[in-house]
């Protein structure tokens, strides 16, 4: 494996913050609890962008390659553009505390595919505390779903509060679980200090239109 670059500054937590150089792919992290719909969202983004951009996906699982296998099975990208990292422990460690394996995998993707525009980095399923290191991704999406009830945004947590985009997924299930989407939207707005929130159902909108619009805006801003 290629060794990652150590070009970075430091944020206020003294964690390495990557400095994205011109021509480097934008890295977007996709995190959230188990079963919230992270992999399905990654698949939707890939299907919509694969004909206009050069992109790749890096998944994280504890002991398996299940998420990467799902993406390959559904042919959202050529197999060589999907890499799995087996974290072998707490999934948030590999995306926040010791990101070496992820950085090396990203280097491998960049070496194998010229002029990548976007790399999606999917975390292993974890609770509401998991966030990405600023040395690993440029921006991050945090995915929750309505199955946990409308109290989830109110509970907060770093992912809900500080992610660049919060996605409340599976809104079509709200009537079945008694979740009030207006309450979820209101509570998310209250804790997110102006950061955007999207409520969506991939069943009703397989293209993930609002999330895709946000991804496009990040790509445009990144130049």
Curated annotation (Swiss-Prot):
The keyword DNA-binding appears for this protein: no
Listed GO biological process terms: urea catabolic process
GO CC, alphabetical: cytoplasm
Record's subcellular location: Cytoplasm
Residue sites binding GTP per the record: 32-39
Pfam family, one: cobW
Region (Disordered): 1-30
Keywords per UniProt: Chaperone, Cytoplasm, GTP-binding, Nickel insertion, Nucleotide-binding
Superkingdom of this protein's organism: Bacteria
Main location: cytoplasm
Biological function: Facilitates the functional incorporation of the urease nickel metallocenter. This process requires GTP hydrolysis, probably effectuated by UreG.
Family recorded in the similarity comment: Belongs to the SIMIBI class G3E GTPase family. UreG subfamily.
Subunit composition and interactions: Homodimer. UreD, UreF and UreG form a complex that acts as a GTP-hydrolysis-dependent molecular chaperone, activating the urease apoprotein by helping to assemble the nickel containing metallocenter of UreC. The UreE protein probably delivers the nickel.
NCBIfam families on file: ureG
Name of the protein described by the UniProt record: Urease accessory protein UreG
Lineage of origin: Bacteria, Bacillati, Actinomycetota, Actinomycetes, Mycobacteriales
Protein's gene: ureG
């Amino acid at each position: 494996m290629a060794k990652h670059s150590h070009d970075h500054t430091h944020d206020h937590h003294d964690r390495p913050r990557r400095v994205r150089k011109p021509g480097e792919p934008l890295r977007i992290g996709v995190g959230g609890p188990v079963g919230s719909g992270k992999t399905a969202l990654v698949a939707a983004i890939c299907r919509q962008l694969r004909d206009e951009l050069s992109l790749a996906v890096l998944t994280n699982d504890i002991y398996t390659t299940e998420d990467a296998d799902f993406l390959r099975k559904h042919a959202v990208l050529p197999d060589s553009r999907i890499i799995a990292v087996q974290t072998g422990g707490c999934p948030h460690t590999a995306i926040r505390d010791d990101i070496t394996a992820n950085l090396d995998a990203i280097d491998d993707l960049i070496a194998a595919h010229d002029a990548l525009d976007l790399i999606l980095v999917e975390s292993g399923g974890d609770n509401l505390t998991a966030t990405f290191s600023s040395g690993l991704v440029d921006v991050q999406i945090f995915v929750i779903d309505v199955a946990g009830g409308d109290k989830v945004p109110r509970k907060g947590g770093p992912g809900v509060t500080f992610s660049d985009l919060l996605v409340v997924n599976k809104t079509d299930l709200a009537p079945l679980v008694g979740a009030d989407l207006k309450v979820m939207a209101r509570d998310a707005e209250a804790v997110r200090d102006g950061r955007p929130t999207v409520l969506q159902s991939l069943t009703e909108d397989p293209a993930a239109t609002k999330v895709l619009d946000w991804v496009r805006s990040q790509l445009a801003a990144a130049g």
